Amino acid sequence: MASTYRTTIRANTYQFRETTMIDPKKIEQIARQVHESMPKGIREFGEDIEKKIRQTLQSQLTRLDLVSREEFDVQTQVLLRTREKLALLEQRLSELEARDKPEEVKPAPAIPPVDPQQE
């Protein structure tokens, strides 16, 4: 049973490392899974143990460099607006460069050298 408990903890820890956002529902689910994987005698302590597991998970997760879903969504929108502005600026720059680019200057026709004796 102890190995099942450790496996569950490792799997859940790996899951959280793979995500960058804290989802309260996910914390509840993990706390429930940990609680259910405990031996029956410990599980009988009930809701108190589950609350402590949830609190421990949340405190450990706050020590990680994670962002909330709201903050992630805000940064996603900022990035999209920045990309749009960049695309517009690149297009404008191309237009300005094309407009200001001098026409290709054709070299003047070569003038044959003047031979002083022919004059």
UniProtKB/Swiss-Prot annotation:
Domain of life: Bacteria
Pathway assignment: Cofactor biosynthesis; ubiquinone biosynthesis
UniProt record similarity statement: Belongs to the UbiK family.
Region feature (Disordered): 96-119
Gene Ontology terms describing biological process: ubiquinone biosynthetic process
Keyword ATP-binding included in the entry's annotation: no
Gene knockout outcome: Mutant is growth-deficient under aerobic conditions and is impaired to replicate at physiological and high temperatures. Mutant is defective for proliferation in macrophages and mice infection and has a severe attenuation in virulence in the murine model when inoculated both orally and intraperitoneally. Deletion inhibits colonization and invasion of four human cell lines, impairs flagella formation, activates the expression of type-1 fimbriae-like structures on the cell surface, enhances biofilm formation and reduces bacterial motility. The deletion mutant is menaquinone-deficient.
Known partners and oligomeric status: Homotrimer.
Bias-annotated ranges (Basic and acidic residues): 96-106
Subcellular localization(s) per the UniProt record: Cytoplasm
Coiled coil: 79-99
InterPro entries, per database record: UbiK
Pro residues composition-biased segments: 109-119
NCBIfam families associated with the record: UbiqAccUbiK
Functional note: Required for efficient ubiquinone (coenzyme Q) biosynthesis under aerobic conditions. UbiK is probably an accessory factor of Ubi enzymes and facilitates ubiquinone biosynthesis by acting as an assembly factor, a targeting factor, or both. Dispensable for ubiquinone biosynthesis under anaerobiosis. Required for proliferation in macrophages and virulence in mice. Significantly contributes to colonization and invasion as well as host inflammation and innate immunity after infection. In vitro, has membrane fusogenic activity at acidic pH.
Organism: Salmonella typhimurium (strain LT2 / SGSC1412 / ATCC 700720)
Protein name in UniProt: Ubiquinone biosynthesis accessory factor UbiK
Keywords: Coiled coil, Cytoplasm, Ubiquinone biosynthesis
GO cellular component, one term: cytosol
